[in-house]
């Protein structure tokens, strides 16, 4: 048994240095194998509003200064779907991590400002090695990325030379370099279906996404035991309650959710595919089980619909503290100072 750091689960606590320590029970999984390891609009009609972090009196001034800095730097501003509304509204592109990185690579910008978390900025650097990549907060990490240290992955790979490693894009550049192929939540099923039939599949780092892909494909895989700490907060009970309150509203869940939540969903899909589902749905209201920042994007894309954040047992919505570390003030300062800059070793 390979023991690695497990940074996600049902119970969370804040440790020294702002790092998250999360634990969860080890039983009840239905996957082939588990390693035991120690992407300014009115809000929805219901009155729910995605929280803004910048005071209104500062918003206009900061926005003008950021746009001027963008011109001065010949920069492109990218915002992940989970960013605060004022950053989404100011960005050139809003979307999922890989889609944004691809979009930035196609521009003539000299500087990419990625409002997201660290592995996303790394992905942008991989696809645009000659561009400067800035991240508003250097400490904006990810529980999934932290759950899969490269040295522990090497140890596991050494136990089976026949492993074919499929890495979810939510991982470090070092883990990507150790993998045979990279996938997103939107194409994971196709990637697994196309994997060599004579290889033993190892899926890292999200066990819930991996388990969902196993359900879709029937292909056995060894799953790294990592989770997004946000998406495992929803429970069967909390989702059942909100569905009873809104019986006519379909539930859309991200595949990073646990099986107990996925089994209650009308659609399980990536953030970008959520937009298409909501556009096509005849329902007037939709329950969304992903990070709450996505509701701002959905409300702008489908202003005629009501979007209901799926509640957890602890709160009425669910935020990623790492995503919310980025603010308009930090965006301004990182552009003014041209740091923090994300760099990668040339050999990597």
Residue ranges and their predicted role:
Residues 1-2, 31:
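Accessible peptide chain termini
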Residues 3, 7-8:
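Cysteine-centered motifs
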Residues 13, 17-31:
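Short, Lys/Arg-enriched N-terminal segments with co-localized hydrophobic residues
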Residues 32-269, 273-288, 294-295, 299-309, ...:
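Active-site loop-to-helix "anion-binding N-cap" substructures in soluble metabolic enzymes
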């Amino acid at each position: 048994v390979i023991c690695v750091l497990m940074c996600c689960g049902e119970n969370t606590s804040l440790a020294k240095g702002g790092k998250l320590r999360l634990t969860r029970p080890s039983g009840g999984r239905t996957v082939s194998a588990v390693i035991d390891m120690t992407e300014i609009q009115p809000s929805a009609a219901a009155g729910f509003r995605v929280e803004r972090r910048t005071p209104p009196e500062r918003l206009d001034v900061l926005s003008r200064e950021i746009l001027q800095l963008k011109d001065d730097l010949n920069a492109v501003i990218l915002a992940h779907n989970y960013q605060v509304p004022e950053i989404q509204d100011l960005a050139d592109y809003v979307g999922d991590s890989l889609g944004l990185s691809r979009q930035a690579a196609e521009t003539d910008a000299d500087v990419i400002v990625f409002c997201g978390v660290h592995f996303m900025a790394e992905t942008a650097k991989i696809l645009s090695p000659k561009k400067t990549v800035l991240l508003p907060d250097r400490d904006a990490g990810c529980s999934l990325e932290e759950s899969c240290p490269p040295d522990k992955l090497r140890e596991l790979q050494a136990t089976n030379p026949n492993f074919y490693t499929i890495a979810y894009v939510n991982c470090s550049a070092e883990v990507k370099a150790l993998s045979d192929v990279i996938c997103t939540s939107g194409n994971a099923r196709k990637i697994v279906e196309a994997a060599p039939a004579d290889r033993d599949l190892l899926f890292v780092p999200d066990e819930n996404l991996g388990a969902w892909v196993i359900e879709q494909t029937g292909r056995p895989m060894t799953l790294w035991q990592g989770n997004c700490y946000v998406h495992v907060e929803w429970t069967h009970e909390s989702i059942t309650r909100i569905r009873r309150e809104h019986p006519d509203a379909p539930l859309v869940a991200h595949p990073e959710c646990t099986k107990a939540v996925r089994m209650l969903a009308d659609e399980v899909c990536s953030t970008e595919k959520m937009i298409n589902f909501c556009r096509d749905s005849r329902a007037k209201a939709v329950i969304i089980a992903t990070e709450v920042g996505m509701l701002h994007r959905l409300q702008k894309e489908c202003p005629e619909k009501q979007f209901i954040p799926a509640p957890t047992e602890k709160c009425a919505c669910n935020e990623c503290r790492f995503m919310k570390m980025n603010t308009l003030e930090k965006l301004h300062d990182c552009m003014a100072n041209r740091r923090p800059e994300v760099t990668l070793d040339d050999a990597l």
